[in-house]
Amino acid sequence: MTKEIIKDAEERMKKAVEVFRQELAGMRANRATPALLDKVRVEAYGSEVPVNNVATIEVPDPRTLVIKPWDRSLIKAIERAINASDLGLNPTNDGQVIRLSIPPMTEERRRELVKVVAKRTEEQRVAIRNIRRDANEQIKKLEKDKAVSEDESKRAQDEVQKLTDKYIKEVDQLMAAKEKEIMEV
């Protein structure tokens, strides 16, 4: 019984870390990556879809993204979506493709981004701790209902704590790597 609780907690912690990893990938650092456009949604064919569902995104050099729409009639819609996003990038289009030049970030903007990363990291730590709390409550309920012994309950809670420590450490490592990437000039 406790094995299922531990397995469920680990799955949920893994998902939390993966979501965090994707969120960090979408944060702008000093180089162009297609992940920058993950949150940009384009009005196309009567619905809003991610840019990468209607175009190919290439990185010809570290400071440029090239967006090649599969349907050229979407160029204006993609341009509008990028302008409406909070990326602070100015698209230029030549009728065939859209180019995004990634300007170097100011020191102030880098510091702001580091603060955002720290805030998101803390949110992920809290999410992981909440998963731990839920798992421990389920284990304690089993113990209270005499479904498992006190020793088994303690062992399971220790296992959940080890998982918590492991995933919080992983989140901290992701944060450190992203901060280093952001502060690179």
Curated annotation (Swiss-Prot):
Signal sequence: where? none
GO terms for CC? cytoplasm
Family annotation (InterPro entries): Ribosome_recyc_fac (IPR002661), Ribosome_recyc_fac_dom (IPR023584), RRF_sf (IPR036191)
**GO molecular function: any one?**
ribosomal large subunit binding
Q: Per UniProt, which keywords does this protein have?
A: Cytoplasm, Protein biosynthesis
Q: Which SUPFAM superfamilies match?
A: Ribosome recycling factor, RRF
Pfam families (UniProt xref): RRF
Q: Does the keyword Cytoplasm apply?
A: yes
Could you provide one GO biological process annotation from this protein's UniProt record?
Answer: translational termination
Q: Where in the cell is it found?
A: Cytoplasm
Main localization (coarse): cytoplasm
Q: What does this protein do?
A: Responsible for the release of ribosomes from messenger RNA at the termination of protein biosynthesis. May increase the efficiency of translation by recycling ribosomes from one round of translation to another.
Q: Which family does it belong to?
A: Belongs to the RRF family.
Task: Please identify the protein, giving its name as recorded.
Answer: Ribosome-recycling factor
Q: What is the lineage of its organism?
A: Bacteria, Bacillati, Bacillota, Clostridia, Eubacteriales
